[in-house]
Amino acid sequence: MASPALAAALLAAEGPNASGAGEGGGGVNASGAVWGPPPSQYSAGAVAGLAAVVGFLIVFTVVGNVLVVIAVLTSRALRAPQNLFLVSLASADILVATLVMPFSLANELMAYWYFGQVWCGVYLALDVLFCTSSIVHLCAISLDRYWSVTQAVEYNLKRTPRRVKATIVAVWLISAIISFPPLVSFYRQPDGAAYPRCGLNDETWYILSSCIGSFFAPCLIMGLVYARIYRVAKLRTRTLSEKRGPAGPEGESPTTENGLGAAAAAAAGENGHCAPPRADVEPDESSAAERRRRRGALRRGARQREAGVEAPGPGLGSAAADPGALSVSRSPGPGGRLSRASSRSVEFFLSRRRRARSSVCRRKVAQAREKRFTFVLAVVMGVFVLCWFPFFFSYSLYGICREACQLPTPLFKFFFWIGYCNSSLNPVIYTIFNQDFRRSFKHILFRRRRRGFRQ
């Protein structure tokens, strides 16, 4: 909703004679003189530069969000129901880039509204609808993450594709309710003005209500939700630190979703998949170490058989370290046969030791994942506030104290274009930090390119 709000603020600053009701480039003032299109406030070089920058922003927004949609719909790793939020969010940002930003750019460069009053009303409603929908989607995603952290088991059972789609419909309905007033209350231009303009209702009640509904209320909800998530993460990190040490008799640990302090779920990767083996150990190195352990076990078993020592029981050391040692110590020979009870003890000790190692690994993965998750939340909140807060704060101040609180026009324009940048940054925030999206992007872009080269 930035561009119509900018037009309304500029109309108030320029006075009533700056507005017009014409359809196109000309108008007639109160004295009956015919005016042509107003002179542009930018030089030819500035027009070309601004058009290039905004054009790149539009293309980047469309391409990035289209990649998000394709990745979620085609990648098996991204078919979780909650990723439908990202599809809907990307769709809203694509619509902002295609149906709002080009007309905002034309209105800015030409210094008047060229496209007529009918499209002006539609344009105002679409602007508010898509931008508000983008913000409300971020709010819905934050609530989804909060419930998945605090009510992992119950919420996972409830979070079906049908429920997620119903939530998405509710998001669009809320955005439509907020954006509907511009269709019936957009700025009414006075008769006899020189140039046509397109702006929202300039009354204080509309400015404040739209700012609260489109920004401040969702921002407050997101702040409270992310603060709660951060507190839960800190609490579980502290709990893990206190419990650090040897695992219990069964090697068990608490489990939750999303890796926030859960030992079992923390073994999952960045997107809930099982964590791969250690990446710093190559297969050849692992097999070589395995062969060395087996040779050592063979030598120890041979020495035990020569000495006539019976294989140990539950306190087994070398055999417990490797299944290979167990197979050797079971080989026939004087004093070298394990009893059935000793064999069960060895198997129990081996499984217990494997669980203990797995528990320690899961603790480390959980702590690392909590830090990464907290960082992503900080990026989401920081970019969201950075993009939208300056515009909505200055716009609401203008609605309260008018000219006394009005910012310089160039600064106000900069604030509202920064708000549009949020649509292009959403794919970066929600995908670049995600390995599955990175792999899917590479698969989409480079595999098709290779096919083109082969053909």
Curated annotation (Swiss-Prot):
Cellular localisation: Cell membrane
Segments of skewed composition (Basic residues): 291-302
Annotated region described as Disordered, given as residue ranges: 241-340
Marked site positions, Implicated in catechol agonist binding and receptor activation: S210, S214
GO cellular component terms listed in the entry, alphabetical order: plasma membrane
Residue spans crossing the bilayer: 48-72, 85-110, 121-143, 165-187, 204-227, 377-400, 414-434
Protein's membrane topology: Multi-pass membrane protein
One example GO MF annotation: epinephrine binding
InterPro entries: ADR_fam, ADRA2C_rcpt, GPCR_Rhodpsn, GPCR_Rhodpsn_7TM
The keyword Transcription appears for this protein: no
Site description Implicated in ligand binding, residues in chain: D127
Keywords assigned by UniProt, alphabetized: Cell membrane, Disulfide bond, G-protein coupled receptor, Glycoprotein, Membrane, Receptor, Transducer, Transmembrane, Transmembrane helix
Listed Pfam families: 7tm_1
Disulfide bonds: C120-C198
Extracellular-side segments: 1-47, 111-120, 188-203, 401-413
Glycosylation sites: N17, N29
Annotated GO biological process: platelet activation; regulation of smooth muscle contraction; regulation of vasoconstriction
Cytoplasmic topological domain: 73-84, 144-164, 228-376, 435-455
Family: Belongs to the G-protein coupled receptor 1 family. Adrenergic receptor subfamily. ADRA2C sub-subfamily.
Function summary: Alpha-2 adrenergic receptors mediate the catecholamine-induced inhibition of adenylate cyclase through the action of G proteins.
Name of the protein described by the UniProt record: Alpha-2C adrenergic receptor
